[in-house]
Amino acid sequence: KVYLKHIVNGQEVMMDSAVVKNRCFHFEGTAPKDVEAAIITGFDNGSAQLLLEPGNIKFKPFDGNFPVGAKAYGTKNNDIFVGYAMLHSKNADDAKVNIVTLRASLPDSITNDDRKYMPYHGAIFNANGVYYKADVMDYYLKHIDSEASLFILKYDLYYMFKPKYLHDVFMAALPERLHSHPIYK
């Protein structure tokens, strides 16, 4: 059995359950008024995340042994989140390439001496962080008219910027219609 849950006041609350047959399961019902984050649990190794909204939400690739690797798609906001997950992967890959490129550009006398190498590594680490923040901000602004932008704000931008900057820049940029969403409040 698997369970569809959402978080209410920090607690997982079950919304529905389904029996797994032939490695498939199905939930059917009325979506909440506001798009909300949900999880599917009941697996041995974690859960799968999704944004609960009207439509036919599917997962790919879905492996019960590694459910956290599955991405929800098939609806506007879940498709935006798939793109967001790909952005995370791309940034991680780019960061690795940047570090490898840096190491290859330095003489052995620096790369073999941690004291000499650490300032270079620290600089590329910080640069990778700036590139990541810039990409997140760009993606957020490209999708600012969607409810998914609220979740990007909550799960990523919230940890990157001071509250005043978050409010004055990112929240102020949101369309008026999203101001009534519970996450905005």
Region roles according to the model:
Residues 139:
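Conserved functional acidic sites
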Residues 150, 164-168, 184:
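Conserved positions within tetratricopeptide repeat
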Residues 1-134:
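A non-transmembrane, solvent-exposed segment enriched in polar/low-complexity residues
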Residues 145-156:
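Amphipathic alpha-helical repeat scaffolds of TPR domains
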